[in-house]
A protein has these predicted regions:
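A glycine/threonine-rich phosphate-anchoring loop and its flanking beta-alpha core
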Residues: 1-33, 130
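Glycine- and other small-residue-rich loops at beta-strand/loop junctions that grip anionic moieties
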Residues: 8, 37, 201
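Active-site segments that bind and position negatively charged phosphate/pyrophosphate groups
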Residues: 25-156
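C-terminal charged capping/lid subdomain of soluble metabolic enzymes
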Residues: 139-218
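Short runs of predominantly hydrophobic/aromatic residues within well-ordered alpha helices
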Residues: 12-16, 65, 109, 183, ...
Length: 218
């Protein structure tokens, strides 16, 4: 009941962040070492998606809000990543946006995850395809490749973010279209001024990070 007074926008931010704390573990090199971890992660994501839709329409729905709170605890305690390594590149992208523009954390993640996913999809299209089938219940079309199904899964995730009124571009985030200088500054900050790469699933250097920021710059 303590959640009932939350602004609708902050509920949406919470839904996205809970999803991201699991997705940033779900997509990692080699994947978790056992099926159980995947099953827990996929079940949590489906639950948050369903409860999120309800909560965004009725923030006083006790059942929906309790599901979100419970999922938040499980998503943040590393249960959904046991046996694997954390990627968390999208969180790094988001932190720099929040630092430069005072944007809400969850909102930066809904902008950056679809762009990151499209940029790295060829690292493991089968993993993204499985995500689409297991979480979004997508059915593979006749002759559809892993990559095509993977892109459909990414699009479906982005559509969900829009459906709960979360931003998916810089303009929707409220910061407008950025200059090339601003994009380069974001990439520099994200790499600690060219001293590190970001992520484990597909490690990204300055050029890769800049490319992902450019994809969101609309």
């Amino acid at each position: 009941e303590l959640t009932y007074t939350l602004p609708r926008y902050q509920v949406g931010c919470g839904v996205v962040d809970i999803m991201m704390h699991t997705l940033e573990r779900y997509f990692n090199p080699g994947h978790p070492s056992n099926r159980m971890t995947d099953e827990i992660a996929e079940g949590l994501l489906r639950t948050v998606i369903d409860a999120g839709r309800v909560a965004m329409q009725d923030s006083h729905n006790y059942d929906a809000m309790s599901e979100i709170m419970w999922a938040g605890s499980l998503s943040h305690n590393n249960l959904t990543g046991l046996g694997g390594v954390k990627d968390f590149s999208v969180h790094q992208f988001g932190h720099e946006l929040s630092g430069m523009f005072d944007a809400a954390h969850g909102a930066t993640l809904s902008v950056m995850w679809p762009q990151w996913a499209r940029y790295v999809v060829d690292t493991d299209p089968a993993r993204f395809a499985h995500y689409g089938e297991a979480v979004w219940r997508l059915t593979r079309k006749d002759g559809e490749s892993d990559r095509d199904l993977a892109l459909r899964a990414i699009d479906t995730t982005e559509e969900f973010f829009r459906s709960i009124d979360m931003p998916t571009t810089f303009t929707e985030l409220g910061i407008g279209v950025l200059s090339e200088e601003q994009l380069r500054e974001l990439a520099e900050r994200c790499t600690f001024f060219h001293t590190r790469v970001v992520g484990k699933f597909c490690p990204l250097d300055y050029d890769g990070i800049l490319a992902v920021y450019r994809m969101a710059n609309k």
